Amino acid sequence: MKRLVLICISVIFLMFNAATNGRLSAQQTFIERLTAHNRMMSAKQPVFISPLVGADPRLIQYAKLSVAHQYTSTGTETVNYGNGRGAGIIVGDRFEFDFVPPPYIQHNSAADDGFGDAAVSAKFRVASANKEGGNYDVAFILGHCFATGSHKNGASTDSFGPTLAAGYAFHRFDVISSVGAILPTGKIGTQGRSIAWNTVSQAHIRPHIWFEIENNASFFAGGTHDGKMQNFMTPAAFYIVRGKSWKATHPTFIVDGGMQIATSGFHTYNHNLITELRMLF
């Protein structure tokens, strides 16, 4: 697994160098080329902020630290350190590659604590335009989750996760929607398959402040949840940290948080408090 991750990272960086060396100054350092390429891609896209839960159709370069606190109806708290978040890098004009390290899961119950599954994904920008060209973005994402979890803290087998995401911005508001699936590579009878449909409305109310409300729906086919559906409403807030000396060449830090609130009769947990620290570069 470690060797595979190192190979993937090496290939991505080689692709990035090949894609950017022809357009950016050879006198720039790798970090300067990295940030300059990100600015070039951002100029082709609308101004969104990545949803707390749902997929982002834009190509972005980022690193995220995320912690989730899930609470069941009996009051049991499960803490997920990592929460399926990691880092991403833009390669060329149309691709983003992401790596999600295994999260650490603390159950606060009789279940064994341990590490969950690692994952990778590739995002392809189908079409996009900034506010001068239509203010929209459409992307296809293909993820692969590796069954690396310990003590049953992950899936029984690997799985693929295709997702279609799109967004449209209008003045200080935008709407983002995505539809995706989790398709295990084996043991379908026990694991089942699922479809996730996320819809997000965002408002950029102040230069440093965004608010959003998400609807997170999951539909299950096969497995222990066969035929069931769960839904969460997720309000969230984002604060962009930029000092007076901030420049476009500097990284941007974002502090954000929100709460998933169960609104369906069936749900695997009642509430999920999510907090994050993001760095965009």
What are these regions (language model features)?
Residues M1-L34:
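Cleavable N-terminal export/targeting peptides
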Residues G22-F281:
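Transmembrane beta-barrel domains of Gram-negative outer membranes and organellar outer membranes
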